[in-house]
Amino acid sequence: MKKILAALLVSFALLSCKDEKKQEKDLLNEVIKVHDQVMEKDQLIMTNKMQLDTLMQQNKDPQLNNEAKKLSAQLDSADARMEDWMHKFDAENKGKSHQQIMDYLSAQKSTIEAIDKQFNTTIATSSAFVKQNKSK
């Protein structure tokens, strides 16, 4: 009877370890998926920055140039935030408990989702500005 109970406990422990590793891997994959979506938009950041720079060179309107500079700074800020996140992100999580890993990855997912939102907002705003002022 004791052997059966011991075997059940060992089986349960092994299954729960596999389940924890799967949870960690699934959450990591979610973080990476959002990261990849943001990286796809990085080229739009650079394109919009170049278009804003061109607008500033072609126009002498100080109000338009000030707005273009502000939007360019927002694009730089979004890009810098992404770079900073990538440099600090640790996908390995060695020596941490399951709960610590899940907490870390959850926080990282929230951060990268906020960066994605910032990318979307700055790209949309700067694209609309460029489109509106291209012919001026």
Residue ranges and their predicted role:
Residues 13-16:
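C-terminal motif of bacterial Sec signal peptides marking the signal peptidase cleavage site
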Residues 34, 38-39, 97, 101-136:
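C-terminal amphipathic alpha-helix
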Residues 47, 51-54, 58-61, 84, ...:
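Heptad-repeat coiled-coil alpha-helices
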